[in-house]
Design a protein with these regions (language model features):
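A conserved hydrophobic position in a structured secondary element of the catalytic/binding core
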Residues: 51, 69, 87
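C-terminal, non-catalytic tails of nucleotide-sugar-dependent glycosyltransferases
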Residues: 112-133, 222-229
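Membrane-embedded multi-pass helical conduit in multi-pass membrane proteins
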Residues: 144-230
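Catalytic donor-sugar/metal-binding loop of nucleotide-sugar-dependent glycosyltransferases
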Residues: 65, 74-92
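Active-site donor/metal-binding and catalytic loop motifs
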Residues: 87-102, 119
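Conserved glycosyltransferase catalytic-site signature
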Residues: 47, 67-72
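Loop-to-transmembrane boundary segments
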Residues: 128-150
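Long helical/loop segments within the catalytic core of UDP-sugar-dependent glycosyltransferases
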Residues: 1-64, 107-110, 114, 118
Length: 239
């Protein structure tokens, strides 16, 4: 899936987030699933999922104890050696129409991702599993995802600030140039894949890359909000 359905209606920051989320969806939902490595982070998306009903019932259907049932189900599949096979047909989804809604949506996802140890214990306790090690690797990947989500922007900004304090402007330029190159490659690959698989004609521009870079720098605002607010009731999200 990708998140450009309402792209033209969004402000520039949210356009950047639509690219950021599309980058993530294409990498973890498509590319990592095709590579089929237990060491890579993969996930399922409930509203685009095709699964045998008997298998789903054996797994206890969609879990509602944790806020994001897709993450829970994805880990259950790993615990039972059920391969996640991506469909080469993409769904074009909407990006939240306001920054507030996007933050709340991301906080819901992050809360479940960060509860990887609770999910592990819940699955082991309540369901039959066939491969604990594979499930443990899946939970570790959720930990890596949560750590990267909240930590990458912080490390990036601290690296730039540290180099500025030391007046090492060459390092500052190298960090910024490397980061922009990373965003540029990610965005171009994502747009190209979308155009091929969904027969679209999206264009990549410097403006798109710039706002995708801005969105990535502040992409941890949802996780930070989740930690600070520590909500006990799930936010109602747009998707």
């Amino acid at each position: 899936s990708y998140c450009l359905k309402n792209y033209k209606e969004l402000n520039n920051i949210l356009k950047g987030f639509s690219i950021y989320q599309s980058n993530f969806e294409m990498k973890t939902g498509l590319i990592n699933s095709i590579l089929n490595s237990k060491l890579l982070y993969t996930h399922v998306v409930g509203h685009g999922l095709i699964i045998n009903m008997k298998t789903l019932n054996e797994l206890g259907n969609f879990n509602t104890k944790f806020w994001c049932e897709d993450i829970y189900l994805g880990l259950q599949l790993k615990f039972n050696n059920i391969k996640i096979t991506p469909l080469l047909t993409l769904e074009n989804m909407e990006t939240p129409s306001s920054l507030e809604n996007l933050i709340k949506q991301n906080s819901v996802w992050f809360k479940t991702t960060s509860q990887f140890s609770k999910i592990y214990k819940d699955i082991i306790k309540n369901y039959k599993v066939t491969n604990k090690l594979n499930g443990l690797i899946g939970c570790f990947n959720e930990f890596r995802c949560a750590l990267n989500w909240i930590g990458f922007p912080i490390i990036l900004l601290l690296s730039i600030i540290g180099a500025l304090i030391l007046k090492n402007y060459l390092i500052v330029l190298l960090i910024i140039a490397s980061y922009l190159l990373y965003i540029c490659i990610n965005t171009k690959m994502t747009i190209k894949l979308i155009n091929i698989l969904d027969e679209q004609d999206y264009k990549t521009s410097l403006k798109i890359i710039f706002f995708a870079a801005i969105a990535t720098v502040i992409s941890n605002i949802g996780p930070i909000y989740s930690i600070i607010s520590n909500k006990k009731v799930k936010h109602k999200t747009e998707r």
